[in-house]
């Protein structure tokens, strides 16, 4: 059985993270599972978590009146789900629809924001990694 530290350290988002920072990140992390056809979050909900996807697929959807959901992206193993927790107003911009049973590491955004505010080097490292995704 893999430890949480190893799982996070092997995920592409945190690969190569300094051990000092890893200890801080671990304090905000938990293992989670989501069943097929459930929603991890919905547009407008408060965004306080982000996810390191380990297994499964999740569709990011937007809704328009009188239409079926529009899939704007499908995310899977090794990817990150959610960055709305990082900057105000901390609300999700999409629905996250689970397409197949999914395993992930959930990182508490409030916890990580607090640690980033207390340790600016950690904050810079996290911001650099997210900038590489959204750029």
What spans do the regions from the language model cover?
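Cytosolic regulatory regions built on CNB/CRP/Popeye-like sensor folds
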Residues: 1-135
């Amino acid at each position: 059985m893999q430890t949480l530290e190893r799982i996070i350290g092997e995920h592409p988002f945190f690969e190569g993270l300094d051990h000092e920072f890893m200890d801080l990140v671990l304090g905000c992390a938990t293992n989670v599972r989501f069943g097929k056809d459930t929603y991890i979050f919905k547009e407008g909900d408060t965004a306080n978590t982000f996810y390191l996807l380990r297994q499964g697929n999740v569709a990011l959807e937007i809704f328009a009146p009188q239409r079926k959901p529009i899939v704007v992206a499908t995310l899977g193993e090794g990817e990150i789900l959610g960055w709305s927790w990082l900057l105000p107003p901390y609300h999700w911009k999409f629905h996250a629809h689970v397409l197949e049973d999914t395993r992930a590491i959930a990182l508490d955004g409030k916890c990580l924001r607090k640690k980033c505010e207390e340790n600016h080097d950690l904050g810079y490292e996290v911001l650099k990694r997210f900038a590489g995704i959204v750029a």
